[in-house]
């Protein structure tokens, strides 16, 4: 995938302001609340019975941070995202059997979370760059499925 200098700047500039623990936890919690069928992959996380339970679940928060920390590797390696996520793609396909559509859903949720956190700083140009990034990451994670 080709990135313009402006796209790279918009992505890395915003990433530098992201609170990974807060945004990661919120993104995963929102995924589990908005798309409840995704909860089946997190049975070991305990109580996910209500939005309040999901939002307050420390395992959701911790894994959300882990997911977004990993996403940060895409930001650092914009020109080699497929390679960056090769092992994670294998893990999610072969061992965890995660539906690859869930990667797209989580990417869309992340864009919503960033918009909520950054308001006017999350301009349409910034959103377009991030939407492109989450699509590329979702595709890289789904690569092992093809």
From Swiss-Prot:
Gene3D superfamilies hit by this protein: Globins
Subunit text: Heterotetramer of two alpha chains and two beta chains.
Matches recorded under InterPro entries: Globin, Globin-like_sf, Globin/Proto, Hemoglobin_b, Hemoglobin_oxygen_transport
Entry protein name: Hemoglobin subunit beta
Biological role stated in the UniProt entry: Involved in oxygen transport from the lung to the various peripheral tissues.
Organism domain of life: Eukaryota
Tissue localization of expression: Red blood cells.
Domain named Globin: residues: 2-146
GO biological process: hydrogen peroxide catabolic process
Keywords, comma-separated and alphabetical: Heme, Iron, Metal-binding, Oxygen transport, Transport
Gene Ontology, cellular component aspect: blood microparticle; haptoglobin-hemoglobin complex; hemoglobin complex
Family as reported in the entry's similarity comment: Belongs to the globin family.
Residues engaged in binding heme b: 63, 92
Pfam families noted in UniProt: Globin
UniProt feature coiled coil, ranges: none
Record GO terms (molecular function): haptoglobin binding; heme binding; metal ion binding; organic acid binding; oxygen binding; oxygen carrier activity; peroxidase activity
